[in-house]
Amino acid sequence: MVVGDGRACLSNEIAADLDLEVIRYSQVWEDYTLLEQAYCIREDYRILSVGSAGCNVLALLLHRPQAIIAIDMSLAQIALMELKFIGIKYLSYPEFLSL
């Protein structure tokens, strides 16, 4: 995984006020079916997605693309996404839902 500080691409005024070390979204509420319809995902696709809380990335994985590249300016959001992936791998469904 390549990680960088997203503030480098922003104006100084915006970057000064942007705290990338807090979790802003713990769950995404957008309708992921819109993404699915827009992508028309096939198994040979490589998809670029905003990481955010990881919900859309997980939904897109159900279509078994070749790869998904998830990006986010916030290291906290990336860490949350990774924790969700690890939780899915190692916890039971009820344990995961209780988080």
Name every feature range the model reports, one short phrase each:
Residues 70-75:
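Conserved acidic E/D residue at the C-terminus of a beta-strand in Rossmann-like folds
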Residues 53-65:
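Conserved SAM-binding loop of SAM-dependent methyltransferases across substrates and taxa
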Residues 33, 69, 89-93:
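General structural signal for secondary-structure boundaries
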Residues 24-46:
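Conserved alpha-helix/loop element of class I SAM-dependent methyltransferases that forms part
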Residues 2-25:
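N-terminal regions that are enriched for targeting/export leaders
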Residues 43-53, 68-69:
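Conserved class I S-adenosyl-L-methionine
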Residues 6, 76-99:
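Class I S-adenosyl-L-methionine-dependent methyltransferase module
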